[in-house]
């Protein structure tokens, strides 16, 4: 719904499910959800999660408004400012900002922001982002090294295999890419 621009960013969008498998959680994380709530849950847990998600929406409203206006440059700039000032939800803003920078083709800036996130906190999504920026800037071999390190830390990180396969294709290593994509599909069979 978000990708089709049918659901505004100001709307809090949660998935409520009894499915707790890694594949289901990974698939939900790839979608544009604000949260994932496992059943059973208490009313107070639901209230707390929705309240926190709504608070995040309020803090990041200028960023979401810029995205909805297709002003990705402004949105990326607002994300970088929030990250640098360590304002509330600075890591969340950095994640949005890096995606916007990649979309805008500003790969070096995206990589710099990903690396700043890693320096602040070693988060897997930031390391994955460094690899994506490396591929986009023609450094597929360096991306493979980055991704192999990430997979070494967490062999169940399906997105890392997906990006690794892309890097292998870029280098013409098609048989390796097929095996890598096979591993990714085994980790997330329902996606």
Regions found by a protein language model. Give the residues of each.
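Alpha4 helix (beta4-alpha4-beta5 surface) of REC/receiver domains from two-component response regulators
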Residues: 7-10, 20-35, 48
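Hydrophobic/aromatic residues positioned on beta-strands within the core alpha/beta folds
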Residues: 14-16
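A Lys-centered signature of the CheY-like receiver
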Residues: 39
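Residue-level signature for tetratricopeptide repeat
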Residues: 61, 65-69, 100, 133, ...
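Receiver (REC) domain switch/output surface
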Residues: 46-57, 62
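Start-of-helix register in tetratricopeptide repeats
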Residues: 57, 91-92, 125, 159
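Flexible loop/N-cap segments at domain edges
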Residues: 108-191
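"A position-specific structural signal for the A-helix of alpha-solenoid helical repeats
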Residues: 61, 95-96, 129, 163
């Amino acid at each position: 719904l978000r990708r089709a621009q049918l659901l505004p960013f100001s709307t809090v969008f949660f998935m409520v499910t009894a499915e707790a498998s890694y594949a289901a959680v990974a698939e939900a994380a790839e979608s544009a959800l604000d949260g994932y709530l496992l059943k059973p849950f208490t009313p107070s847990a639901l209230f707390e999660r929705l309240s926190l998600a709504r608070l995040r929406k309020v803090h990041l409203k200028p960023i979401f408004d810029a995205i909805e206006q297709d002003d990705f440059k402004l949105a990326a700039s607002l994300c970088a400012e929030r990250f640098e000032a360590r304002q509330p939800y600075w890591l969340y803003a950095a994640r949005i900002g890096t995606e916007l920078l990649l979309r805008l083709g500003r790969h070096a800036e995206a990589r710099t922001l990903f690396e700043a996130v890693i320096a602040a906190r070693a988060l897997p999504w930031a390391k994955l982002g460094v690899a994506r920026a490396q591929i986009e800037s023609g450094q597929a071999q360096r991306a493979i090294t980055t991704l192999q390190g990430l997979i070494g830390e967490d062999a169940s990180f399906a997105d890392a295999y997906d990006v690794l396969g892309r890097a292998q294709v870029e280098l013409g290593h098609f048989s390796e890419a097929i095996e890598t994509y096979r591993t990714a599909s085994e980790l997330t069979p329902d996606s």
